[in-house]
Amino acid sequence: RAYGIATLRAMGVKSMRVWLRLPLFVLVGVLTAAVGELQYSVFIRGDWANLLGSMVFNAVYLTGAFVVVWALFRLLPRRAAFLACVILAAVAGLGVEWFLIGNSPWGNPDAGQLGMAAYWACLVVVPLIVVDGDARLRPLKRRIAVYAAVYTLAVLLGQWLLPAGDWRFAFHIWTVVIGYLVLLVLCVAGYLRNAR
């Protein structure tokens, strides 16, 4: 009986540590989305309210995603859980884009589906990597931080240097699509190579 109570206490402590990561997970996810949202909401549309609304929605979405991530990592082997998170985040994100925002292939054929899927996958995958305590992921975390800094600087320079109009619009749309695709590839390749 004492063994059972000790086991339950240990499980409770471990579970508590997991849930203490939730605020960091949400914060990193919101920051991951922030540059892309800034580009679309503010630099293209000039709509600060949309940026704020997106950040609030993303925080709520990430809270739910954290629960799903936690469950997947308890049920599946680590790499399988990670890949399941990537796929589910991309698919769920496309669901948000299609049914809540109106960026479906039939409603907005010009919307970049692959870029949107990568954006939503990164929204979950980047914080998943950041909150992971595995020391083998430290180099990947540094690469993500450097990439984020370079990407943000490039976006700000583009906004400052390019004239308003079509060039600036195209720059922001394509840097979001390509930027989040590259970030997703960096995350998936780095995680699968380093995590055990």
Task: Go through each PLM region and give its residues.
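Aromatic-rich, lipid-facing transmembrane alpha helices and their immediate juxtamembrane interface loops
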Residues: 1-196
